[in-house]
């Protein structure tokens, strides 16, 4: 599964970037605006949510369990220092998607055991979007982690962190 995580870069902001990837065929968008105010997040989130719905794409909000319902999002993605998955599940219920960030096999197993619907494993390589970056995994680290995790779980895992269009086969 290809998951687009919004990031202001060059001529694209969250809205134009979302529109571009949806027009290109992506059907999973995570709205990530780490330094935005709640009002900005709501404003941009409403537009991104409408775009996702018009393309029948999954719309995930990063970190903000409290805004999932207000934005009509399909779910939330939680970092390792965010609200625990089990607590988010109690708030959102079983119908919402909850993703969790992991950097190790132990993190992956903990996310699976706590009720996450998918795992974002990373970072793949160095990224400028995180201040306190976990150890970079690279392709070798991903292969090792996935081999060990697949012995325990079949939960979907997506690669995150520093991935560019050049990493995606045409």
Where are these predicted regions, by residue range?
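Short alpha-helical segments enriched in small residues
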Residues: 136-139
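A short, flexible beta-alpha/helix-coil linker loop
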Residues: 125-127
């Amino acid at each position: 599964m290809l998951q687009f995580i919004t990031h202001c870069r060059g001529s694209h902001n969250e809205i134009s970037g979302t529109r571009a990837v949806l027009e290109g065929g992506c059907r999973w968008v995570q709205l990530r605006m780490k330094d935005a105010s709640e009002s900005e997040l709501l404003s941009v989130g409403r537009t991104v949510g409408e775009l996702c719905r018009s393309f029948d794409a999954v719309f995930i909000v990063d970190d903000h369990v409290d805004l999932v319902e207000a934005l009509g999002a399909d779910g939330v993605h939680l970092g390792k220092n965010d609200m625990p998955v089990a607590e988010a599940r109690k708030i959102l219920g079983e119908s919402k998607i909850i993703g969790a960030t992991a950097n190790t096999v132990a993190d992956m197993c903990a996310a699976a055991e706590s009720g996450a619907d998918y795992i974002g494993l990373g970072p793949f390589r160095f990224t400028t979007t995180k201040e306190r970056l976990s150890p970079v995994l690279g392709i070798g680290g991903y292969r090792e982690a996935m081999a060990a995790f697949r012995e325990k779980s079949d939960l979907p895992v997506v690669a995150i962190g520093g991935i560019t269009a050049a990493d995606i086969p045409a």
